[in-house]
């Protein structure tokens, strides 16, 4: 049973080569507590893989920096989150950036953060970008929302989101740092394709690193999808839950990635540059799936 309902009658089919090419340079997200469960990232990830470190409210900066140092020392590009709404003031931001620089970090993901009330003077990623604190960083990524963000646009539109995206594109033109838009995870290719095309039409030319949920139990994914505000593509999971033959099987991102890989192969100028995984079913499980499905793009640095 197909999991997608595309409007176009015939979607191109991906080849194994298409998927391998699409997964090249993929990244993955961890938290300090999940990173602790991995004995050696070199046993599961290709050398140089970008590893985002999610900064959840309440996590001490010392734990974040220690995790960044450990993963960087193992040979991976580290990109910690900088959630604006949990950063108290410029002094705190400057301290965080300095600590990360001391352990070799030169990349960061700017985002507002899922906190209703800001802890201090920052409430948006644009304020962080304008702060000047990230001089010397080689990469500055920002967040993207293919299915909208009601925290930003409560009316359900994407007016404010698109306005911010255009501002970030203009900022990218005046900075030396490489920029890209890393997105929330989605489960359906159709709204992603429409959104990426719309970005281009709106004059937003930041490369998209599309967020995809890694293999996980269906119940786990539905819980995270609801909590994170994933919209239209949640129907993909709900439809799967109604199929008793699939209800107990783990979800795998094969269909959505094959569809996106085929679209990219047929449209080389399509704005998705890389895939970013949210390992909701575990880092090792996610990495093993990429190794099994991505050919050389998933080959770990060394055998476990």
Model-derived regions, located:
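Conserved beta-strand positions
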Residues: 30, 53, 110, 142, ...
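Hydrophobic, aromatic-enriched interface-forming segments
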Residues: 156-174, 178-200
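Active-site glycine- and acidic-residue-rich loops that bind
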Residues: 88-89, 115-123, 183-196, 218, ...
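Active-site beta->alpha loop and helix N-cap motifs at the rims of alpha/beta catalytic domains
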Residues: 2-163, 170
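Short acidic/polar active-site loop segments enriched in Thr and Asp
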Residues: 106, 179, 273
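Active-site pocket-lining/capping segments in soluble small-molecule metabolic enzymes
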Residues: 30-32, 124-148, 158, 164-167, ...
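Short, well-ordered secondary-structure micro-motifs
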Residues: 120-121, 152-154, 193-194, 219-228, ...
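Conserved, mostly hydrophobic/aromatic
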Residues: 80, 168, 177, 210, ...
């Amino acid at each position: 049973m197909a999991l997608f309902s595309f409007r176009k009658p015939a979607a191109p089919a991906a080849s194994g080569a298409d998927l391998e090419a699409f997964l090249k340079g993929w990244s993955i997200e961890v938290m300090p507590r999940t990173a602790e469960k991995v004995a050696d990232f070199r046993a599961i990830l290709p050398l140089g893989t970008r590893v985002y470190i999610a900064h959840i409210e309440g996590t001490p900066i010392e734990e974040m920096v220690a995790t960044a140092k450990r993963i960087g020392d193992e040979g991976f590009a580290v990109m910690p989150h900088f959630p604006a709404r949990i950063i108290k003031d410029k002094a705190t931001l400057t301290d965080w950036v300095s600590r990360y620089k001391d352990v070799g970090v030169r990349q960061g993901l700017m985002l507002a953060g899922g906190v209703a009330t800001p802890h201090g003077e920052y409430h948006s990623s644009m304020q962080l970008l304008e702060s000047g604190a990230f001089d010397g960083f080689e990469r500055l990524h920002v967040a993207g929302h293919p299915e909208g963000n009601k925290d930003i646009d409560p009316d359900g539109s994407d007016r404010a989101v698109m306005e911010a995206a255009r501002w970030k594109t203009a900022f990218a033109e005046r900075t030396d740092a490489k920029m890209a838009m890393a997105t929330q995870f989605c489960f359906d290719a159709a709204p992603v394709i429409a959104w990426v095309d719309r970005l281009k039409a709106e004059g937003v030319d930041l490369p998209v690193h599309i967020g995809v949920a890694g293999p996980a139990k269906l119940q786990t994914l539905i819980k995270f999808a609801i909590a994170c505000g994933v919209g239209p593509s949640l129907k993909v999971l709900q439809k799967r839950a109604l199929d008793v033959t699939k209800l107990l099987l783990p979800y795998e991102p094969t269909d959505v990635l094959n569809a996106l890989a085929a679209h990219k192969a047929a449209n080389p100028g399509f704005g998705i540059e890389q895939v970013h995984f949210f390992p909701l079913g575990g880092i090792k499980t996610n990495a093993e799936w990429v190794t099994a499905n991505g050919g050389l793009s998933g080959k770990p640095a060394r055998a476990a």
